[in-house]
From Swiss-Prot:
EC number: 3.4.19.12
Keyword Magnesium: no
Stated role: Possible hydrolase that can remove conjugated ubiquitin from proteins in vitro and may therefore play an important regulatory role at the level of protein turnover by preventing degradation.
Assigned protein family: Belongs to the peptidase C65 family.
InterPro entries assigned to the protein according to its UniProt record, in alphabetical order: OTU_dom, Otubain, Papain-like_cys_pep_sf, Peptidase_C65_otubain, Peptidase_C65_otubain_sub1, Peptidase_C65_otubain_sub2
Record: residues binding substrate: I168
Designated name of the protein: Ubiquitin thioesterase otubain-like
Alphabetically ordered keywords of this record: Hydrolase, Protease, Thiol protease, Ubl conjugation pathway
Amino acid sequence: MEPFTHNDGNRDELIIQQKRDIEKEISDTTPLVSEQLPLTCLYAEYSGDEIFTAKIQDLSKKYKFIRRTRPDGNCFFRAFAYSYLEYLISNTSAYQEFKKLAEESKEKLVQLGFPSFTLEDFHETFMEVIQRVSPDNAGGHSTVQDELHKIFNEQGYSDYVVVYLRLITSGKLQEEADFYQNFIEGDLTIEAFRHLEVEPMYKESDHIHIIALCTALGAGVRVEYLDRGEGGTVKAHDFPEGSEPRIYLIYRPGHYDILYPN
């Protein structure tokens, strides 16, 4: 093995700085959650690519709009939260059920061993966000929808929601550790996986995150996979299997955005 040199250190610093510059450019130019956009905007991203063009065409038979999320590793949790709250704005009884579940979630996490002082601020902010998008709030649906969009583009609120959903996901993995251990490749324990891949911000999500969160909150999600797979059609997967989806997401390698059915 060649000895470490000063140049190696400089190169590492340069790589780290380049990564920071890219992250800053993304945060400066990309909103946390975009406005609704026509699904056809995807064509421009894959111009000249026959496989993706055919799949976007297939997708457009089922969906009319897309809402982008910032590609920062938190996209699944942010997209999930925005889309589910958007659904709840129009469904008062489902909203009340979710609000009750959210209120009780902190105590459940404490019983699972999460320190109460760690949860306090995140849970408080989570409940504030839920209250601010209540279907009963003054101004009607469009006013509440505007409030939801405003909240999710305020970094503090938006990130606190993501953190709390990560904690709920981690709690579900701990609660049903024997079941979820089957989804983890390699020698990682559930505890190590939770601390390394679930609780930290900016860590990307996989099927295990989706299943755990959907199960914890009783919310069905349909994910449409836009990839290079054969067939010319987009494959969909419902989480949990057999559930009725309330949230529709599109997955492209490493990233989730929100979809709106026709």
